[in-house]
Amino acid sequence: AMLMKILDLAPGDARAVYKNIVYDMRMYRRIQMFVHAEQIIGDDSNLQDYETTVFIRLGSDHTQNYYEYEVPLKLTPAGHYNITEREKVWPEENMIDFPLDLLTQVKTNRNRRIKNTNGTMSTPFSEYDPEKPQNKVTVVGNPNLGDVQTMLIGVRNQSRTSKNVEVWVNELRLTDYDEDGGWAALANLAVNLSDVGSVSVAGRYETAGFGGIEETLQERRLDDYY
């Protein structure tokens, strides 16, 4: 869990915290995190719903090679809440919850656009989440979910005036581990060319998810091999 209290956040500006990690996310299907936002007590900046956003970045770095997912924030009114009012404190629309393959799909779309327009990978490319059209996905550079080295969580001011805001984030997690098994095939071919000689050919093919009986899920093959 983490609390971020941000003061005098200028229009279009952002503040964030990051952590260096080494993680392969390819065997997970979704990423989730609860998010709460509220106006700071005594604040006179007249903060409104959706004027600030929370975002998460995943990549080999947080400036040149990353995926970003951004969610507009609904504010929780000041007050006292009991356990039955949990959704008022942690609104569902604030929750970061999306399939990881959405990130790679946006990257694929970006690469097609670059090919057709002679663009560059260093220019941010954004699309909106088709399941949650208010949420935005951005890709910069050449990030790889198989080699995530940094994770960043931040808050951005989307309004035209400076804002103060308090944001809580909790239970960041990867879910829906891919337990589907793969398969492997081995072929050997020997051809006798009469008096000329003989030729032997061998081939092996393994799909993602294949592994030995003694191997754990994490030790199984993560990509196709042939």
Language model feature labels by segment:
Residues 11-14, 23-32, 38-43, 49-51:
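Extended extracellular/luminal ectodomain segments enriched in beta-structured repeat modules
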Residues 29-32, 47-61, 90-162:
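Extracellular beta-strand ligand-recognition surfaces/modules
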Residues 176, 205-209:
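Transmembrane beta-strands of outer-membrane beta-barrel pores
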Residues 187-191, 226:
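Residues on the lipid-exposed face of transmembrane beta-strands in outer-membrane beta-barrel proteins
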Residues 194-196:
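Outer-membrane beta-barrel channels and translocator barrels
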Residues 199-205:
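Transmembrane beta-barrel strands of outer-membrane/channel proteins
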